[in-house]
Curated annotation (Swiss-Prot):
Organism of this sequence: Pyrococcus furiosus (strain ATCC 43587 / DSM 3638 / JCM 8422 / Vc1)
PROSITE patterns according to UniProt: ADOHCYASE_1 (PS00738), ADOHCYASE_2 (PS00739)
Record has Nucleotidyltransferase as a keyword: no
Record-linked PANTHER family: ADENOSYLHOMOCYSTEINASE
Catalytic reaction equation(s): S-adenosyl-L-homocysteine + H2O = L-homocysteine + adenosine
Pathway(s) served: Amino-acid biosynthesis; L-homocysteine biosynthesis; L-homocysteine from S-adenosyl-L-homocysteine: step 1/1
Keywords: Cytoplasm, Hydrolase, NAD, One-carbon metabolism
Protein name from the UniProt record: Adenosylhomocysteinase
Length: 421
């Protein structure tokens, strides 16, 4: 462990390799490049302190460097103990970001490092799962008056924050970046869809075609996972609790059944619900020998490991990121990435082109909080549509795509009520 006054990383000497990764992904993130140039010129965050809890890998690093380019003092800690890339955080430390993260850090270190990131007494918090915002409300209440607001990247985090708002304990405004069109329509669907299977295939080196894939949850992440599984040649089964989403999955061409029925026939199970104990003892007991389980939800609670451990007579690790649970009857069940985010633990997370849009929204959310915090209430907000559209237009422009524009006559027609049959 290599720790100094403003950082704690595995090894600072890894920085050069980290810079190579950051440089590579930045070439495929034109929207964030555009915003970085804008921030470098205008310095909107001069004198502003920003603390972030994120998956500390190469795309996230480019976001943090973009905020720093805008004049911010930036600190960061990991939002998952297993998603940190040690070479990338070394590069961030060298660049002057106050960063505290080590891949494989303990639960105690996880919160210790988060406290260190908060020691800058931030004006803005950028969160991924709402752990940092929750920690401030529970243990660092003395700094609440200095916090203008925060932003949240994930579905899971937004659920937690809305619960805080409903309970009347949220003390500052938070932007639900996850709920922006340019986030959930692309990041949650196309990003999660591709990166989840990237992680599963890297971890197992197994064929997907011909297998029964059970996708638990048919939100935007589940949609993407199911879509890509079908594209890889799998028979896809969706498990849902929402009757509308279940019907949608069936109309999309997927089989739909409850978890007990799916447990009997699934070869690969992927959870994406944001909820607890979605796959548990009663389901493990029904699974076939060799069944593989992976989680694409934020926390490691969707596949209930305590039940697996109680059922197992032997636990082994046949491959990196694969845990084998041998049961009394001889069956072997496999859990990938210790039940944590398989796309970030066993692979590199979402593609750069996808995170380009999500992190452009995060950068603009921070600027929006800085400019508007005095009039915002302690509630969960969605970014204005014009910011969504700005990100979309820059992305289209970078792809060489020109779209149609409404004529004045068409605009007038859409704004009128007189025209009928």
């Amino acid at each position: 462990m290599d720790c100094g006054k403003d950082y704690c990383v595995k090894d600072l000497s890894l920085a050069e390799e980290g810079w190579k990764k950051i440089d590579w992904v930045s070439r495929f993130m034109p929207v964030l490049q555009y915003i970085k140039r804008e921030f470098e010129e205008k310095k909107p965050f001069k004198g502003v302190r920003i603390a972030a809890t994120l998956h500390l890998e190469m795309k996230t690093a480019f976001l943090l460097l973009t905020l720093k380019a805008g004049g911010a003092e930036v600190s960061a800690a990991a939002s998952n103990p297993l998603s940190t890339q040690d070479d990338v955080v070394a590069a961030l430390a060298k660049a002057g970001v106050k960063v505290y993260a080590i891949r494989g850090e303990s639960r105690e270190q996880y919160y210790e490092f988060m406290h260190k990131a908060l020691d800058i007494r931030p004006n803005i918090i950028i969160d991924d799962g709402a752990d940092m915002i929750s920690l401030v409300h529970k243990e660092r209440q003395e700094m609440l008056d200095e916090i203008w607001g925060g932003s949240e990247e994930t579905t899971t985090g937004v659920i937690r924050l809305r619960a805080m708002e409903k309970a009347g304990i949220l003390k500052f405004p938070v932007i639900a970046v996850n709920d922006s069109y340019m986030k959930y329509l692309f990041d949650n669907r196309y990003g999660t869809g591709q990166s989840t299977w990237d992680g599963i295939m890297r971890a197992t080196n197994l064929l997907i075609a011909g297998k029964n894939v059970v996708v638990v949850g048919y939100g935007w992440c589940g949609r993407g996972i199911a879509m890509r599984a079908r594209g890889l040649g799998a028979t896809v089964i969706v498990v849902e609790v929402d009757p509308i989403k279940a019907l949608e999955a069936r109309m999309d061409g997927f089989l739909v059944m409850d978890m007990k029925e799916a447990a009997k026939i699934g070869d690969i199970f992927v959870t994406a619900t944001g909820n607890i104990k979605c796959i548990r003892r009663e389901h493990f007991e029904l699974m076939k020998d060799g069944a593989i389980m992976a989680n694409a939800g934020h926390f490691d609670v969707e596949i209930w490991k305590p039940d697996l451990e109680k059922l197992a007579v032997e636990i082994n690790n046949p491959r990196p990121n694969v845990t084998e649970y041998k049961l009394k009857d001889g069956r072997r069940l496999y859990l990938l990435a210790d039940g944590r985010l398989v796309n970030l633990v066993a692979a590199d997370g979402h593609p750069a082109e996808i995170m380009d849009m999500s992190f452009a929204l995060q950068a603009k959310a921070a600027e929006y909080i800085k400019d508007n915090h005095e009039r915002l209430e302690p509630k969960v907000y969605i970014l204005p549509r014009e910011i969504d559209e700005m990100v979309a237009r820059i992305k289209l422009e970078s792809m060489g795509i020109k779209i149609e524009e409404l004529t004045e006559e068409q605009k007038k027609y859409l704004e009128s009520w007189e025209h009928g049959t």
